[in-house]
Amino acid sequence: MSFEKLGEDGKARRGRLTFPRGVVETPAFMPVGTYGTVKGMLPRDIEEIGAHIILGNTFHLMLRPGTEVVKAHGDLHDFTQWQGPILTDSGGFQVFSLGEMRKITEQGVTFRSPVDGSKVELSPEIAIQVQRDLGSDIVMIFDECTPYPATEKQAKESMELSLRWAERSKRAHEGNPAALFGIVQGGMYESLRDQSLEGLEKIGFDGYAIGGLSVGEPKEDMIRILDHLPPKMPEDKPRYLMGVGRPEDIVEAVRRGVDMFDCVMPTRNARNGYLFTSAGIVKIRNAKNRHDTGPLDERCDCYTCKHFSKSYLHHLDKCGEMLGSQLNTIHNLRFYQNLMSGLRGAIEAGTLSDFVSEFYALRGETVPPLGDS
């Protein structure tokens, strides 16, 4: 993988990731295909909505179907028939989500499989090997996602453990041509974030991710870390904000210099009839949509908006028809890709401020201030 920075507007960056399997323009949003599928989407649908990279999950794919099944097809690309680049999360966040069901030691984590209750071990070496077996194009180190809230002492111990695991991840990755990304931890403490970043840079990675955000903290804390951290991250490497996915949060992170994003929000919300539009959220199951013959979003060029009315989408939702979830997902993911395309174009043209102003004005909101970092 190579990363080329093509332009800037303020702190925002316009870039390009080049892989043997394809090119990804940044800022980029990666649809999440946890089990090897972006729910409700065929691979050709993902291409048509404009995504060029997707995310898979090491934790879930390791448990089901297992790497031996995937490897029998070749790799995850062959198994899923998605031939573009794939980033795989190492499983650290999913282990964090298990709460009291898991035990963390210096070696790694042991837990009971949510699939069949069997005892499972996950360590830096295992996580990296699983991602090698999957044929990931971007491999994530195995880390501990610092919980919120955490005292400074707890956050420091967690961050230092993640740094030790980062070294082991780097060693385990040797000989794999795929990119390897480090993950900055440290909770809500700027000084710990700095220590984590410094330690990761000494080890050396192909890209750097910001982990441990969108884990329950107030939005002002997330913005405070985003004001502080991205400007300190390597200029010549991609910056990836993990699991943060509200459109406004993506806009604010891009303004602060972040390049890559993923979140289940557009797909999960689509299945629940919670749709993103240029004017804000549309809850399609609300009664007011029953007789609305207009499109979901007049500014959207997706298949759903070009062919179907809000009334029809409301009808599908009320009937529990699977087509409703599919059409909603196509729209939400296309909305996100259009947002990223708009951000890229604005950075190129030096008009990001105007783009951001219009983004908030259409929602009836004012532009939040940028920090001074």
Swiss-Prot record:
Its EC number is 2.4.2.29. It comes from the Bacteria. One of its GO terms (molecular function) is tRNA-guanosine(34) queuine transglycosylase activity. Coiled coil: none annotated. The active site is at residues 89, 262. GO terms for biological process: queuosine biosynthetic process; tRNA wobble guanine modification; tRNA-guanine transglycosylation. It is an enzyme of class 2 (transferase). Its cofactor is Zn(2+). Substrate binds at residues 89-93, 143, 185, 212. GO terms for cellular component: cytosol. Pathway: tRNA modification; tRNA-queuosine biosynthesis. Binds 1 zinc ion per subunit. Residues 243-249, 267-271 are annotated as: RNA binding. Zn(2+) binds at residues 300, 302, 305, 331. Keywords: Glycosyltransferase, Metal-binding, Queuosine biosynthesis, Transferase, tRNA processing, Zinc. Homodimer. Within each dimer, one monomer is responsible for RNA recognition and catalysis, while the other monomer binds to the replacement base PreQ1. Belongs to the queuine tRNA-ribosyltransferase family. Catalyzes the base-exchange of a guanine (G) residue with the queuine precursor 7-aminomethyl-7-deazaguanine (PreQ1) at position 34 (anticodon wobble position) in tRNAs with GU(N) anticodons (tRNA-Asp, -Asn, -His and -Tyr). Catalysis occurs through a double-displacement mechanism. The nucleophile active site attacks the C1' of nucleotide 34 to detach the guanine base from the RNA, forming a covalent enzyme-RNA intermediate. The proton acceptor active site deprotonates the incoming PreQ1, allowing a nucleophilic attack on the C1' of the ribose to form the product. This is Queuine tRNA-ribosyltransferase. The gene is tgt.
